[in-house]
């Protein structure tokens, strides 16, 4: 039989759980509201967002008049606009979603842990935007120029072969590249967090550099379309970020050593 004391302990432990679940529900609802509002806003301007995403193709062919995209069934362009709206909503609502996650986690962190967490919260979207910019200004223009350059003009002995991307396939391509670059550009954040947790150190990263090169190219081959241009466009910046991560981890180790020396001096 359970005693009154044990029942009180069960009730006391149950109360914090209910409070956490209530808080989680509140944060999820706020994040969902932000996403839905951004979705409708982006859907209203989906045409303009898509036109902006198509600009690397426009640059490759020379002018908007020469850029032709097609869709092969009636609702394809509508579904593409819905995808554009969802893509834009996720991008624009991310600061709100990240803040809700932070506000849910922050009460369980010490003050110094909260201060340490904030730079990563800021660095994550910044690095993602840099990755997306690399896609928009470097990878996609190179890929589009290469694709347009493969066209064949009609002659007396050969047919005309034109590059006519589908609206859905173009969107899928640029979204895949943006997500691939955005995720890979989080490498400094991930490795620095692992260093703070004591799982890796700068010497480990230096020793495994040759293996990192192989892994990066394999990941680039998996995440990008099967063409050499986009694979190299992803692999090269990621390797540079790996080197930057070594510097970041070295700084973490230096600060940790200084903090330990200060504590030892106080003792």
Segments (PLM) and residue ranges:
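Membrane topogenic/interface segments and analogous intrinsically disordered interaction regions
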Residues: 1-267
């Amino acid at each position: 039989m359970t005693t009154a004391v044990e029942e009180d302990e069960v009730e006391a432990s149950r109360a914090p759980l209910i409070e956490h679940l209530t808080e989680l529900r509140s944060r999820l609802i706020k994040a969902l509201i932000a996403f839905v509002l951004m979705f409708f806003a982006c859907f209203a301007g989906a045409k303009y967002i898509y036109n902006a995403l198509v600009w690397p193709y426009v640059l490759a062919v020379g002018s908007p008049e020469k850029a032709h995209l097609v869709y092969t069934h009636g609702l394809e362009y509508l579904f593409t606009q819905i995808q554009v709206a969802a893509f834009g909503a996720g991008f624009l609502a991310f600061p709100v979603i990240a803040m809700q996650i932070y506000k849910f986690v922050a009460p369980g962190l010490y003050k110094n842990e909260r201060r340490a967490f904030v730079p990563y919260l800021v660095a994550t979207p910044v690095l993602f935007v840099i990755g997306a910019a690399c896609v928009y200004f470097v990878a996609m223009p190179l890929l589009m120029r290469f694709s347009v350059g493969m066209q064949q003009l009609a002659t007396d002995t050969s047919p005309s072969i034109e590059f006519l991307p589908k609206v859905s396939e173009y969107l899928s391509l640029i979204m895949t590249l943006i997500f691939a670059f955005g995720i890979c550009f989080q490498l400094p954040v991930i490795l620095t967090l692992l260093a703070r947790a004591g799982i890796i150190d700068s010497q480990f990263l230096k020793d495994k550099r040759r293996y990192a090169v192989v892994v990066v190219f394999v990941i680039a081959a998996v995440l990008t379309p099967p063409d050499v241009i986009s694979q190299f466009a992803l692999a090269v910046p990621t390797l540079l970020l790996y080197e930057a991560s070594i510097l970041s981890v070295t700084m973490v180790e230096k600060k940790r050593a200084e903090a330990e020396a200060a504590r030892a001096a106080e003792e």
